[in-house]
Amino acid sequence: QRGGGNYESFSGDLSSYDFSEWFRRGYNQQARYGWLKSEMFSDKAKVVYEFESFYNHSSYIYPALADFQRSLGAQAAAMWHYSMTDYAQYNGGSHVFNLKTTPAKAAAFAVASKVFQNTPILQNYHVESPSNFQSQNFSYSLKKNRSIYSDDSYFFYSNDVLDMGKMITSKSPKEIFGYGKSPLVNYEGTGTYQLKISEKEIIVHIQPDVVYNHSLSYRSKRKKHLITEFENQKKHAMTISIDGWESGKFTIFKLTETGKKKKIKGIKELRLKIAPGKYKITKT
């Protein structure tokens, strides 16, 4: 509507727009997506061709889409767009997605993958609240601009989730992928991070801080202007709070691209001052 119905005329940010009515109509109306629930298509494969949003860089929309699509019987979904890092910094507009340049979306996409994998197809859809929802294992919220997936092995989230509501988080997951602060990891940087946790070691992978020169909705003509820039050297505080790693003797190693490791220091608790990169933390 803002672009007069013309795709090329639209310019803006729909991250805070409430798509609740779109979800309701899509689910309830036969002429939209309701036909997918009919008996005629009950034995047909259902694949989402474009799993993507439009001028939306929020932390909730991808998990909301995954939940909606599973309720319609979708068995697989293909991501519509991914900007390779070499040119992602110049990319803005309707479809922008990259691990480094769009950390909130990247973390939300990780949440969405778990929602899609672990939500039964054709479950009853919550049409009364399609943009703000919480189940036992996942939640997403337009109001709080965040999303969470949590089970015994995984804890994924996008944006600060210090208040988990009624969700119960495992204190000993095998993998954490996040953007922002959470009860398990408090990280002050602006990139995503990933922790892979075993009994005796933690592999930590931190993406660089991202600095925005323009809105992600900005279209750089001929890709001449840097939309985003990276800060690779700045150190930030990171506190890790998981069972079995509360205190003791730990050693931190910096891992190189060739797989070699360089000892940084020994510590007694997982309160770090750390720059982007890949690290190994071991119990001594």
Residue locations for each model-derived region?
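Hard-cation-handling environments
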Residues: 141-151, 156, 162
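Mature, folded catalytic cores of secreted/periplasmic enzymes
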Residues: 1-3, 12-13, 70, 90-120, ...
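Substrate-binding cleft of secreted/luminal carbohydrate-active enzymes
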Residues: 55-134
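Glycoside hydrolase catalytic-domain groove-lining segments
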Residues: 1-55
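A general structural signal for short secondary-structure junctions and capping/turn motifs
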Residues: 37-39, 68-70, 195
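C-terminal beta-sandwich/jelly-roll accessory domains of carbohydrate-active enzymes
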Residues: 156-284
